[in-house]
């Protein structure tokens, strides 16, 4: 999973470029590119995603985010933050049009395409578009249920995830859609340490450094992160699966110097304790 932060306090790799690089050096890993869609030109983005997906043999997922937490990013690229919802929804519609084999034209409020398609097209004709939301608002749940291929849930508790899955299921059925078509993925930040209090402190300080602020609410770490011993972390991860997550994306929440060690501990101790395994190969890429 690669995030999208045009302006950030730490080095941050651009998602499309990174996926393109990794596509040429791997053969099984699925890539989730988190993209703040209102900041992107739909035509250019559709082209970049299609080529990355083609080169990776169908291993790309586009996770669209609304953005808005950092208005300066919008101002920096000449976009009015008030337009973000309209641009977000139109970007999804325009990209799906461009991946369609049938020629035609697209005319929206912000994007007009006189005609033409993207070639080469995505490996399987289209790329899954997930919505990266906390699922707080009625409108965001409605979008997930009606126009998305999946929900990438970040910064939610397991309880909130379960509630969101129930709400999305109801809305999808009301819309006449099979809820099983909507893949649910939870993003959980993990830090393994035998001292739970230290784990809370380290992760809170790490987020404060990342956001460039003096302090970070430790209650956020307690609520959303998997912290403590391997068994404690495993129990927290398992709670997301029990709440309805089909996949859990694990992000080591630690200073860079500890990253490799945390990955080893998570892989060797936490995942087995949680009864989880590394993600399988997508069916279309086998």
What are these regions (language model features)?
Residues 1-286:
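Active-site-adjacent structural elements that line small-molecule/cofactor binding pockets in enzymes
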């Amino acid at each position: 999973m690669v995030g999208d932060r045009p302006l950030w306090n730490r080095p941050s790799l651009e998602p499309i470029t990174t996926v393109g690089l990794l596509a040429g050096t791997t053969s099984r890993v699925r890539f989730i590119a988190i993209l703040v869609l209102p900041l992107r030109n739909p035509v250019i983005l559709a082209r970049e995603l299609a080529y990355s997906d083609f080169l990776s043999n169908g291993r790309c997922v586009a996770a669209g985010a609304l953005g808005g937490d950092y208005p300066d990013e919008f101002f920096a690229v000449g976009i009015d933050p008030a337009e973000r919802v309209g641009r977000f929804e139109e970007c999804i519609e325009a990209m799906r049009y461009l991946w369609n084999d049938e020629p035609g034209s697209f005319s929206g409020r912000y994007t007009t395409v006189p005609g033409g398609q993207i070639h080469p097209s995505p490996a399987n004709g289209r790329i899954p578009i997930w919505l990266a939301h906390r699922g707080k608002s009625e409108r965001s749940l409605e979008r997930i249920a009606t126009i998305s291929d999946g929900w990438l849930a970040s910064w939610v508790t397991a309880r909130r995830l379960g509630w969101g899955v129930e709400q999305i299921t109801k809305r999808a059925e009301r819309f006449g859609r099979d809820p099983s078509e909507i893949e649910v993925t939870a993003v959980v930040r993990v830090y393994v340490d035998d001292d739970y209090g230290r784990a809370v402190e380290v992760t809170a300080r790490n987020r404060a450094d990342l956001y460039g602020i003096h302090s970070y609410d430790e209650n956020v770490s307690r609520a959303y992160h998997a912290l403590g011993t391997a068994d404690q972390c495993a129990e927290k991860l398992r709670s997301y699966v029990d709440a309805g997550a089909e996949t859990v994306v694990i992000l080591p929440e630690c200073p860079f110097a500890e990253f490799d060690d945390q990955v080893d501990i998570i892989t060797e101790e936490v995942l087995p304790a949680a009864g989880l395994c590394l993600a399988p190969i997508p069916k279309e890429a086998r």
